[in-house]
Amino acid sequence: MSDEGPGTGPGNGLGEKGDTSGPEGSGGSGPQRRGGDNHGRGRGRGRGRGGGRPGAPGGSGSGPRHRDGVRRPQKRPSCIGCKGTHGGTGAGAGAGGAGAGGAGAGGGAGAGGGAGGAGGAGGAGAGGGAGAGGGAGGAGGAGAGGGAGAGGGAGGAGAGGGAGGAGGAGAGGGAGAGGGAGGAGAGGGAGGAGGAGAGGGAGAGGAGGAGGAGAGGAGAGGGAGGAGGAGAGGAGAGGAGAGGAGAGGAGGAGAGGAGGAGAGGAGGAGAGGGAGGAGAGGGAGGAGAGGAGGAGAGGAGGAGAGGAGGAGAGGGAGAGGAGAGGGGRGRGGSGGRGRGGSGGRGRGGSGGRRGRGRERARGGSRERARGRGRGRGEKRPRSPSSQSSSSGSPPRRPPPGRRPFFHPVGEADYFEYHQEGGPDGEPDVPPGAIEQGPADDPGEGPSTGPRGQGDGGRRKKGGWFGKHRGQGGSNPKFENIAEGLRALLARSHVERTTDEGTWVAGVFVYGGSKTSLYNLRRGTALAIPQCRLTPLSRLPFGMAPGPGPQPGPLRESIVCYFMVFLQTHIFAEVLKDAIKDLVMTKPAPTCNIRVTVCSFDDGVDLPPWFPPMVEGAAAEGDDGDDGDEGGDGDEGEEGQE
């Protein structure tokens, strides 16, 4: 058993024992999908290279927890996993441990080790300390012995030690050294149990940032027994915070992803959460899927120091948002309806004071989007929600049912876009669109467009579209939509204009989400020069279900619509079908766009338009008529966009 003597290293996941039985294999943390989003959303499925028993599942890795991917507590992937092992493959762990550390500690070895008492001894004995073996003895860890500094510590060293997580379990685990070491070994963390023991939470124990780092958080066990998560988990980076403050730590453990999740979250909730947050550790937690946990109760935790938690992407989510950290760079961020920070650069971030921040940040890619969200909910001239909340309820948060709908929509009021694009010359793209990066065609750059100047200043410069309100040009995104529409319209060739040029028919398009409608509207403009489009606006509320108060006639909902004016009824029908077919193939918000045909008995007299240069001059390729039916009337600009 003690074949190779005490296992050496901290178990970088490679099982440096040479013999596969070393539980050392605890999972390494594998390059945790470090993907583009730095803020370790790292769901990390650590790859756990474990040489360990076959039993040793890869660790759960916690994803590089910080932008630079360094795992805070210690840079080596402190074998993150051997999650299940400690209890799991009872034999596995035991045996495995045995293998390496098994050394003397033999007790630690196999079930025996597992045995509380035996384990205790093992842990106690240097043997326990012995690399994995000791850890394996996890049991040792279990016993207060495990807690024992050396014992626990050693265990910690070997992934097995982690296994010893049990040790952590014992108050002993909490014991400084003991806990810490354990933490070192992923096992430590793993032995969520360890964390479990108050000991784990215990300062030093928690300190075993490693532990936290380790699957500790990962070990669902760890995360699970909120406690477990607390101790070890918190230990994770959070551990730094005395173990994330007991439970809080757990949240931090979140890093373990698993830990963070579920119970972990709870931990976050507890003040502990705050503590964890405090330490960078907190952030770590956020990093792991733990973030998820954060979202839940974690959120509460976030409230407190949670801010730190916020740091982790997850953190950002629920709680994080809450805490100042909220902004966190995490994507979830905004979720937190917390007062929180203005949301770092994360996607949802802004969080701002009203939970659903203004998602301005939306395109992480785009540098500009950076912090820009209305940080603290401050000047938002008219928030749709507060607008007319008839009740005296604090207008700040829309009625419960409503929030989710906002989110996807990219919430600002429609009009806010004017203010926003402004000077940066990315005039007309509502936040959703921004995701595309600066797709706006450069031609639209200077805020007043080439021609605006000669305009006699007819309207304020800047604003949404560089030139006049409503002359958005083409750009690859809208062109794409237009292409789809043209293809569908090509199915039937019908008259689109009449000699009278009166606008007697229309298509009313509504639903979906504001951004999807907006984009469809811009696409329609490119596809059908013969139509005229109203700006996007909002539908009023209809009836309240059941008896009871009905909405006021003026009450605006957040559902948008726009109208397409056309000259022939037949083309209106064709266009309706085309739009229906175009949106039904698309994903969520878009496919919910609804269309219906209208007809205007006496037609709608759209005001005549004269090309801008000189009254009546045939500028812009228009034929100088009153623009009523000149097909390219107001789209004339398109060419020079």
From Swiss-Prot:
Active site: Y518 (for site-specific dna endonuclease activity)
Result after altering S388A: Decreases interaction with CSNK2B. No effect on interaction with USP7
Record field: compositional bias (Gly residues): 1-15, 51-62, 84-128, 224-352
Low complexity: bias regions: 383-394
Resulting phenotype, E444A: Slight decrease in binding to USP7. Major decrease in binding to USP7
Induction of the gene: Expressed during type I latency (proliferating memory B cells and Burkitt lymphoma cells), type II latency (Hodgkin's lymphomas and epithelial cell carcinomas) and type III latency (highly proliferating B cells and immortalized cell lines).
Residues annotated with Phosphoserine modification: S385, S393
A GO term, aspect molecular function: endonuclease activity
The name this protein goes by in its record: Epstein-Barr nuclear antigen 1
Source species of the chain: Epstein-Barr virus (strain B95-8)
Gene name in the database record: EBNA1
